[in-house]
Amino acid sequence: MMAKVSKRMKEISAKINAEKKYPVSEAFDLLREVSSVKFVESVDVSVALGVDPRKSDQVVRGASVLPNGTGKTVRVAVFAKGPAADAAKEAGAEVVGMEDLADEVKKGNMDFDVVIASPDSMRVVGQLGQILGPKGLMPNPKVGTVTMDVAKAVRDAKAGQVRYRVDKAGIIHTTIGKVNFTSDALKQNLEQLLTDLKKAKPAVSKGIYLKKVSVSSTMGPGINVDFSDLNI
């Protein structure tokens, strides 16, 4: 098994120059070339930002609605009542409730990928922080998951919204689709993400903000991207 792995790694290393910045379409073509798994891998992106995440006013977080989606089916739970609950159901939310939904969460019944909450439901949701927080599911106004317009938030989540938060090294990690997307679709998704990241630039951030962009498939190596010709 090790021999197989090392042989594959050698083949990949021969195809990818770690020092080179590849044009976007070429980078996506390379991802497909070096993919050797049986499932359809996600295309992940890492963006190194010129921020100091140790400082609270330089923590970059937010959400981006990718024009071509992520290729994933997203199940949405919404904490809301009255007309807001009705609107959430109409928008396609799988689960809608208040205390009853909180009880299900406490029991560990969490068959959903995104949690959205209306502001008046936060008294209920607030009790679930220790359960939802570690799973990255806690609603937050900064990424649009605590909102008066729960129906729009549901539609955005279903349409392929990705959420991001800068890590301790100043890097954003998220997904922009699947390897079976066309290169154009992946490029458009990447452009949207980088555009939204630029809008989220902290006022105190100095120097180069978008420092480095690399893409990879789920099981593949990172490929540096030349993003200078992107429409951002």
Curated annotation (Swiss-Prot):
<dbReference type="GO" id="GO:0022625">
    <property type="term" value="C:cytosolic large ribosomal subunit"/>
</dbReference>
<dbReference type="Pfam" id="PF00687">
    <property type="entry name" value="Ribosomal_L1"/>
</dbReference>
<dbReference type="GO" id="GO:0006417">
    <property type="term" value="P:regulation of translation"/>
</dbReference>
<dbReference type="InterPro" id="IPR016095">
    <property type="entry name" value="Ribosomal_uL1_3-a/b-sand"/>
</dbReference>
<keyword id="KW-0810">Translation regulation</keyword>
<keyword id="KW-0689">Ribosomal protein</keyword>
<dbReference type="GO" id="GO:0006412">
    <property type="term" value="P:translation"/>
</dbReference>
<dbReference type="GO" id="GO:0000049">
    <property type="term" value="F:tRNA binding"/>
</dbReference>
<comment type="subunit">
    <text>Part of the 50S ribosomal subunit.</text>
</comment>
<keyword id="KW-0699">rRNA-binding</keyword>
<comment type="similarity">
    <text>Belongs to the universal ribosomal protein uL1 family.</text>
</comment>
<dbReference type="InterPro" id="IPR023673">
    <property type="entry name" value="Ribosomal_uL1_CS"/>
</dbReference>
<keyword id="KW-0694">RNA-binding</keyword>
<dbReference type="InterPro" id="IPR028364">
    <property type="entry name" value="Ribosomal_uL1/biogenesis"/>
</dbReference>
<keyword id="KW-0687">Ribonucleoprotein</keyword>
<comment type="function">
    <text>Binds directly to 23S rRNA. The L1 stalk is quite mobile in the ribosome, and is involved in E site tRNA release.</text>
</comment>
<keyword id="KW-0678">Repressor</keyword>
<keyword id="KW-0820">tRNA-binding</keyword>
<protein>
    <recommendedName>
        <fullName>Large ribosomal subunit protein uL1</fullName>
    </recommendedName>
</protein>
<dbReference type="InterPro" id="IPR023674">
    <property type="entry name" value="Ribosomal_uL1-like"/>
</dbReference>
<dbReference type="GO" id="GO:0003735">
    <property type="term" value="F:structural constituent of ribosome"/>
</dbReference>
<dbReference type="InterPro" id="IPR005878">
    <property type="entry name" value="Ribosom_uL1_bac-type"/>
</dbReference>
<dbReference type="InterPro" id="IPR002143">
    <property type="entry name" value="Ribosomal_uL1"/>
</dbReference>
<comment type="function">
    <text>Protein L1 is also a translational repressor protein, it controls the translation of the L11 operon by binding to its mRNA.</text>
</comment>
<dbReference type="GO" id="GO:0019843">
    <property type="term" value="F:rRNA binding"/>
</dbReference>
